[in-house]
From Swiss-Prot:
This is Indole-3-glycerol phosphate synthase. Its EC number is 4.1.1.48. GO terms for biological process: L-tryptophan biosynthetic process. One of its GO terms (molecular function) is indole-3-glycerol-phosphate synthase activity. It is an enzyme of class 4 (lyase). The gene is trpC. Belongs to the TrpC family. InterPro entries: Aldolase_TIM, Indole-3-glycerol_P_synth, Indole-3-glycerol_P_synth_dom, Indole-3-GlycerolPSynthase_CS, RibuloseP-bd_barrel.
Amino acid sequence: MEIRRRPPNPPIKVDILQYQIKHPEAAPRHILEEIVWHKEKEVAQRRELVPLVKLQSLVKDMTPPLDFVGALRQSPRQPALIAEVKKASPSKGIIRADFDPVAIAKAYEAGGANCLSVLTDEKFFQGSFENLQLVRSAVQLPLLCKEFIIYPYQIYLARSRGADAVLLIAAILSDKDLRYFLKIIEGLGMAALVEVHTLEEMDRVLALDGVQLIGVNNRNLQTFTVDLQTTEDLFAQRREQLTQGDITLVSESGIYELADLQRLQQAGARAVLVGESLVKQPDPQQAIAALYGEV
């Protein structure tokens, strides 16, 4: 899947004037490309407010990140759970109107989640880095920053707000970027959850050094359709490489009930990332127990 990082006809500035040349492919081809194009602008604006060097200085004085990978691998409950703090999505709209990130995070922690994922994209998911910081102050669990990362700046921003791990989406990053970002993440003592959806993306990620977590997104980020068969197929085709590399497979999206957990665990998933089906319930703590068939 090819993702264009920018529109083919970017605005051109001449002194105080700005113009744009018409182009037949000037519109994003799908939602993922639209998100990436917006992220380009968003990161540029953030850099103007807080330079990268400031973020790098901030993270130097922070306590070391929590062990995100270890929390998943040492879980007595299988598959391990990454519970997501999520208000909305492009496909579902508002998932929880009375959204309180701290209350939800505390409920997840009380329910036995191993790690948390916090959405930080503002425009499409109504998340924020402020939410990440609030959650960090409220719970003791390792945190994943769920962001569409396309620049190192976002990695440092995530760490400065308390993230212990970040999401890297193979579909929107080149192999060169993935290698570079993995080195930055390792240098910060963080973990990377590298997300794939196709066999081609899986093979690209398996060829990289230092990958400990691979997330299989059961949701097609172009169409937003969901199929748990995605996890089953990819693990079946690359079981040997994943096992030999001691890589923990995380299944993401489309997980609603115990039967889904059992199906994915049988397929080879050692952890799951669950958001919508938990956050939309009145009591997220109780929702975790129900998901694992404990009530």
